[in-house]
Each structure stands twice: as C-alpha cells, then as structure tokens.
UniProtKB/Swiss-Prot annotation:
Gene of this entry: ARL15
Protein name: ADP-ribosylation factor-like protein 15
Family matches, as PANTHER family: ADP-RIBOSYLATION FACTOR-LIKE PROTEIN 15 (PTHR46693:SF1)
Chain positions recorded as GTP binding sites: 39-46, 82-86, 142-145
Homology family: Belongs to the small GTPase superfamily. Arf family.
Domain of life where this protein originates: Eukaryota
Organism ancestry: Eukaryota, Metazoa, Chordata, Craniata, Vertebrata
Cross-referenced InterPro entries: ARL15, P-loop_NTPase, Small_GTPase_ARF/SAR
Length: 204
C-alpha cells in the first residue's frame, strides 16, 4: 500500500472518530413532571422524598407549609411539591393543585383508626377534585415495617379504592424507609403512567 493510501486511511479513521465524538449531539433531556404530594402529618412524606434525594434522615423536619424537591430518576425528573398535613393546613391544599401532572398520596398504614379515617376522607376528596381527578395517582401505604401496619389489601378495602378510583390511573403500593428498591419501583410505575398520559395527549 502506498504512503498516500495509508495517509488517506488514517485521515478517514480520524474523521470517523471526530464524527463519533463531536457530531453525536447531547443526550436527550429527561422529561420533567410537576407533582403534588399530600398526606396527613406523620405519614412520612418528607422522609420518603428526602430518602429518594439521598438526603440525611437526621435533617428531616416535618413540612409545615410546603416544600419543593426535584427527585431525579434515570428516565425522568419529578418536581414534587409537598404540602404539610396538619389540620389547619389541609383545608388550603387545593390552592396548590394547579399545574400538577400527577399526585402522590402518602398514608401511615400503622396509624390509629381516627387518623386512617381522616386519611381516607382526604384521599376521597383528592380523587374527586376537578384539578386532580384525571391525573395519575401513586398511593403509598407507608410504615410497612411497623408491627401494626395494615396490608395493601386491607387499605384497598377500607379506602374503597376499587369503586371510587374506577377508570382512573392509580397505583397502591406498600413502602417503608427500609425498602428503597420497592419505593423506587413504585415511582417508576408512576413515571410510566405519566408517560402514557403524555403519549395519549400527543395522539389526541
């Protein structure tokens, strides 16, 4: 092979390397979704979101008004607006619903009967609210690591989810801070629902 052909071969290889490195373009941006996270005080909303953001649990303080966290996942970023769950704050929840693309409802599966009833009433209100009723819901039955925790089937029956949420996009999942794999899987399922809703909107 002549020196000219060798030089041409090397130049062509350099060109291919240049195309691979410089013309590939940036990776596609992850989609972002705006979510609202609600639930009674003590249900564990702040702790779960902080854990997903790899924040130290030692610094967790219950939310009294609202806070916003960007929770990163491999295929999406969830901008979660967490609302405080105290009695005097819950009546203002609906003021913060506008612009939400999905809902996270956290309940304490080991709570007292009174608190569980209050959580059921709040979830029923959210599922029927005009600004939320068409959105995907992730319902987390938290504190499954506690001895008094109710099972997902017990929660589903007590909350009357089958008749109330019929025709809606919703997921009910058990969770605890001790099982991050299950928690991340729950959010992955929610992201799938959000993507499905996006695709449906594009087709319409």
């Amino acid at each position: 092979m002549s020196d000219l052909r060798i030089t041409e071969a090397f130049l062509y290889m350099d060109y291919l390397c240049f195309r691979a490195l410089c013309c590939k373009g940036p990776p596609p941006a992850r989609p972002e979704y705006d979510l609202v996270c609600i639930g009674l005080t003590g249900s564990g909303k702040t702790s779960l979101l902080s854990k997903l953001c790899s924040e130290s649990p030692d610094n967790v303080v219950s939310t009294t008004g609202f806070s916003i966290k960007a929770v990163p996942f491999q295929n999406a970023i969830l901008n979660v607006k967490e609302l405080g769950g105290a009695d005097n704050i819950r009546k203002y929840w609906s003021r913060y619903y506008q612009g939400s693309q999905g809902v996270i409802f956290v309940l304490d599966s080991a709570s007292s009967e009174d608190d569980l009833e209050a959580a059921r009433n709040e979830l029923h209100s959210a599922l029927q609210h005009p600004q939320l009723c068409t959105l995907p819901f992730l319902i987390l039955a938290n504190h499954q690591d506690k001895p008094a925790a109710r099972s997902v089937q017990e929660i589903k029956k007590y909350f009357e989810l089958e008749p109330l949420a019929r025709g809606k996009r919703w997921i009910l999942q058990p969770c605890s801070l001790d099982d991050m794999d299950a928690l991340k899987d729950s959010f992955s399922q929610l992201i799938n629902l959000l993507e499905e809703k996006d695709h449906e909107a594009v087709r319409m």
